[in-house]
């Protein structure tokens, strides 16, 4: 996930006692049009992004780079003297409240305002005269008044977009260079063009309806509660309930609501993690987020995510690497504008991840099974009606990228779930698994569409893949992660979801796999993805593959529960729930197992991508729903 960080490491302190405890995670608010980040340890808001992702589009000067970065307007926004505050989400929502001795501040991005808007308000403590103080991320180039009293339009060097400041209370004279000191409450609204300033003021005025800042926060909270779906799971304690609610919030924050237009087709995409890390939509992580939305009952958001897969464009960039087959679903991830991004690993190669195609068919089939929405299959998308797009640009290229093995088929060599480097591509059991699952779902979809030839083709391919899987990946009574032998994937955390999907049913093989998972157990108490084979500490994966990976923990806990080992499963789950409760109900990508400069902190501290989305809240929600189904 966070391979995109710079891969040059400082010296690593391996001993537990040499690493200080990690600071509490930063809090993120968002409304589908942008993000803002609050850092409790400094009592400061540190970022305000004008888009709900980190990278807008490809960089034509560096096609294998991260892309054009989304504007961030602020480096630091605080009040009074710099100092730590106690911050948390209000009632498990996206509203952040920070308290210090000299006052209380509230930050949120409202869902009712269809713009990248951040509302901030400050209530000074008695006999305190706290005022907002801002450090802009880029030098201020110009500012001008816009119509109403106190409204200002700011332009910055190096940022094409503008920032509109609308006071929500009385305005006073502010020190030079500190416009936010003029009022205790503001709306900060990012604008793509300065000419949009007056329409934005009108939109804001309608949304505000004359309410003061405190009432705006109350109304936002009430509207958010109305949006929530009634939980379909029983909670065993309050911590589980709060983590469910906060996870539901994170899933909503992570989804783009930006409308599609001629130069942007990202509406509905869901990022894999929220800032401060790289907030980018990965096909795979988004599938787990979408599945959580489906099963929770958030049909509108799930439908938007599915449409996003089929409207993203341009795609099919890697046709030469996939036997010339044109395809719709990105082989790795997307830029914010919906352009396919074939993930660059900084080793000079793109990635091919065929499991993505099966995962999209999986979530599409599950959505249609739950909601019976025939109109979705007829919806106009980038490559025609959605059903035909799924058939011709997911199923056909998927089958075209299978290979004969024994009496069956397996998916061609790729980089799969753990994003291996393309020069190290292998035949992964997980990619063949997702092809089996996805084609099984598509057979049902084709039946709904009355397309018998496509249904039969999917079923035939599914059956051949089942045969190929058994021959290729079950050897000597053991389940292996790859066709190619090797210590790294012989026991692999990805084997657990394979079993949970029902691809492997032999109790002896399942039991052996669970027993061998002890080879992946780490000092923090959970499990890593694989046994890393890198020997150079300067390589990112040398450290990354030593840390505890929560997605594997969730999957193993579910398998243990199915095997009747309820006590072990509950202990694994409650450990994650308890650690999240101590950190604003945020679920990280990983826990520190081997402390180092890249993943600092004490053993067991949250690390990696924080807050995670699909592999965090999505995985947690699905785990509780699976537990409910097994009651």
Residues of each region from the PLM?
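Long, well-ordered core segments of solenoidal/helical folds
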Residues: 247-260, 298-321, 329-330, 369, ...
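Bacterial N-terminal signal peptides
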Residues: 8-17
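C-terminal capping/lid segments that line or modulate ligand- or cofactor-binding pockets
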Residues: 25-72, 278, 333-356, 360, ...
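Aromatic-rich carbohydrate-recognition surfaces in CAZymes
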Residues: 214, 278-402, 432, 611-627
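Acidic/His metal-coordination segments adjacent to aromatic residues that form catalytic metal sites
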Residues: 268-275, 331-351, 405-427, 476, ...
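Terminal accessory carbohydrate-recognition/targeting modules of carbohydrate-active enzymes
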Residues: 2, 22-239, 284-285, 294-300, ...
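Extended ligand-binding clefts on enzyme/binding-domain cores
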Residues: 314-342, 351, 426-437, 448-449, ...
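Well-ordered alpha-helical scaffold segments within catalytic/enzyme domains
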Residues: 228-236, 249-250, 287-300, 348, ...
């Amino acid at each position: 996930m966070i391979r995109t960080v710079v891969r040059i490491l400082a010296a690593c302190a391996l001993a537990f006692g040499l690493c200080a405890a990690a600071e509490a995670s930063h809090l993120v608010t968002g409304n589908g049009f942008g993000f803002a980040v609050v850092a409790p340890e400094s009592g400061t808001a540190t970022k305000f992004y004008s888009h709900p992702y980190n990278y807008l589009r490809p960089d034509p000067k560096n096609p294998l780079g991260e892309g054009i970065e989304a504007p961030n307007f602020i480096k630091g926004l605080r009040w009074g003297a710099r100092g730590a505050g106690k911050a948390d989400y209000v009632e498990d929502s996206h509203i952040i409240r920070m308290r210090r001795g000299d006052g209380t501040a509230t930050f949120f991005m409202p869902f009712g305002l269809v713009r990248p808007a951040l509302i901030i308000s400050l209530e000074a403590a008695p006999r305190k005269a706290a005022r907002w103080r801002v450090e802009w991320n880029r030098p201020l180039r110009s500012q001008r008044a816009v119509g109403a009293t106190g409204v200002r339009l700011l332009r910055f060097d190096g940022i094409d977009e503008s920032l509109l400041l609308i006071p929500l209370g009385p305005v006073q004279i502010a020190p030079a260079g500190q416009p936010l000191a003029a009022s205790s409450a503001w709306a900060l609204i990012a604008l793509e063009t300065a000419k949009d300033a007056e329409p934005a003021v009108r939109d804001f005025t309608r949304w505000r309806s004359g309410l003061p800042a405190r009432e705006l926060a109350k109304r936002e909270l009430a509207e958010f509660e109305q949006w929530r779906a009634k939980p379909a799971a029983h909670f065993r304690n309050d911590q589980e309930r709060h983590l469910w609610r906060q996870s539901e919030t994170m899933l909503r924050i992570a989804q783009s609501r930006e409308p599609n237009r001629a130069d942007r087709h990202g509406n509905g995409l869901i990022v894999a993690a929220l800032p401060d890390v790289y907030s980018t939509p990965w096909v795979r992580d988004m599938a787990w987020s979408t599945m959580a939305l489906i099963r929770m009952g958030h049909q509108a958001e799930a439908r938007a995510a599915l449409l996003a897969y089929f409207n993203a464009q341009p795609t099919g960039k890697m046709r030469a690497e996939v036997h010339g087959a044109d395809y719709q679903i990105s082989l790795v991830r997307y830029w914010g504008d919906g352009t396919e991004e074939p993930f660059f690993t900084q080793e000079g190669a793109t990635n091919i991840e065929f499991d993505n195609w099966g995962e999209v068919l999986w979530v599409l089939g599950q959505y249609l099974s739950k909601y019976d929405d025939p109109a979705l299959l007829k919806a106009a998308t980038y490559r025609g009606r959605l059903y035909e797009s799924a058939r011709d640009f997911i199923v056909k290229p998927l089958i075209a990228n299978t290979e004969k093995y024994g009496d069956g088929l397996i998916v061609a060599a790729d980089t799969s779930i753990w994003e291996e480097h393309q020069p190290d591509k292998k035949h992964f059991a997980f990619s063949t698994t997702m092809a089996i699952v996805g084609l099984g779902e598509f057979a049902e979809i084709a039946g709904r569409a009355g397309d018998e030839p496509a249904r039969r083709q999917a079923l035939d391919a599914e059956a051949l893949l089942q045969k190929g899987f058994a021959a290729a990946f079950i050897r000597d009574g053991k389940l292996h992660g790859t066709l190619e032998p090797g210590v790294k994937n012989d026991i692999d955390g990805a084997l657990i979801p394979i079993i949970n999907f029902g691809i492997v049913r032999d109790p002896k093989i399942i039991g052996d796999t669970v027993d061998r998972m002890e080879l992946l157990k780490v000092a923090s108490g959970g499990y890593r993805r694989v046994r890393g084979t890198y020997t150079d500490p300067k390589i990112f994966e040398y450290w990354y593959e030593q840390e505890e990976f929560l997605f594997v923990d969730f999957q193993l806990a579910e398998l243990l529960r199915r095997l009747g080992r309820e006590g072990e499963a509950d202990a694994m789950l409650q450990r994650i729930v308890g650690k999240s409760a101590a950190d604003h109900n945020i679920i990280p990508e990983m826990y520190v197992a081997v402390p180092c400069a890249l993943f600092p902190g004490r053993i067991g501290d949250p690390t990696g991508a924080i807050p995670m989305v699909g592999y965090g809240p999505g995985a947690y929600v699905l785990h509780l729903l699976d537990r409910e189904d097994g009651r």
